Structure formats: C-alpha cells, structure tokens
Amino acid sequence: SFGWAAVQRLLDFDLRQIRIFSRDTKKQAKMERCLHQANPESAKKVTFWPGDILDLSSLEKAIEGVDCLIHAAALKQVPDCERFPIQAVQINVLGTENVLRTAVAAGVKKIVCLSTDKAAYPISAMGISKAMMEKVAMAHAREASGESKICCTRYGNLMCSQGTVIPLFISQIRSGKPLTITNPAMTRFLM
C-alpha cells in the first residue's frame, strides 16, 4: 500500500517522528510488527494513532505539532464508492475538509493530498469524490495565505496494491474462475 511504501522511504530521512493516523488498527498493528522486525531502532520513530478523519477530536490530537502531512485516507475502491456514494463523499470530500481545516489551524507547513487519475474527467462515484477532494484542497490552498502549502498529487493503479486487479486476477485464475472484466475495450495502466 502507499502508506507502507511511504513509511519505508521516510525512514531513510532524518525525521524526528512519523505518525500513522488510521481507523484500521489491524493494519497499524501489522505495520508496527513488521517495522520492529526489520529495524527496531528506526521503528521507534513511528507512532500509531487510531482515529478517523470524520472525528475532529482524534484528528486534532494526531495533527498537533506536525510539520508535514500526507493525506492518504480515502474510500478508494470503485465498487464500494458506487454502492455507497454518500460514504464516498463523507470520507473523500468532507473527511478531507476536516484534515485540511485541522492541519491549517495547527500550523502544518506542508500538506500533500493523494488523489487518483480517476479524478480527471470522472465517470465514477470514486472519481467524482476525489475530483471534489481536489477542489476542496485547492480552495484551502488559496485561503491558507502562505502559512500552509497544500498540493494534490494523482496516481493510478499501483501494481499489486490492495484492491487492484492483479491480486484479484491471480485469485480468480488460481480458483479456476473467469476473470472479471468490467469493459473489454478498457485499457488499464499500472505502475
């Protein structure tokens, strides 16, 4: 996942602390175990904060004293966003509003919001919600008066990351099931 890869890269730098804020405590526990096994000394720099971007009090505590923030929280599975579009808006748009408002108020200097290639000319609930997330971020960037630098970056399908088609296709092939192709004319780009 992006979070795991980002933490591994960030540990290469001389950072005082890396905070992982997530509502998925199972993933946090797994990451903590893996970090301690790989390098117990570096792992001391990483702290885990359970919470939800829709819960302002947990967000405020986690962001206090932070210099840079990477906002990767999202409802990112296209089928989930299609089935639950209100949750896509709540998490991807309103959750981002909470993160940005809290981060700017706390004096965070640099904020990067992760988006998706599906936000360009969106046709899905996920793409639409991420396009709106970008609009929210850019509105905050204009209002931040230079105190907080805010940007968005788009990336596409990361090969073998959670929720991409490759693990799904491997599972379907191994179990002898047909591959689920949404649209045979579609081209999928993987990084």
Feature roles, as predicted:
Residues 22, 49-50, 90:
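Conserved residues in the N-terminal Rossmann fold of short-chain dehydrogenase/reductase
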Residues 9-17, 107:
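Conserved S-adenosyl-L-methionine
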Residues 1-2:
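Hydrophobic/small residue at the entry helix of a nucleotide-binding pocket
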Residues 33, 47-68:
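Conserved Rossmann-fold cofactor-binding substructure of NAD(P)-dependent oxidoreductases
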Residues 14-30:
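Conserved glycine-rich Rossmann-like NAD(P)H-binding loop of the short-chain dehydrogenase/reductase
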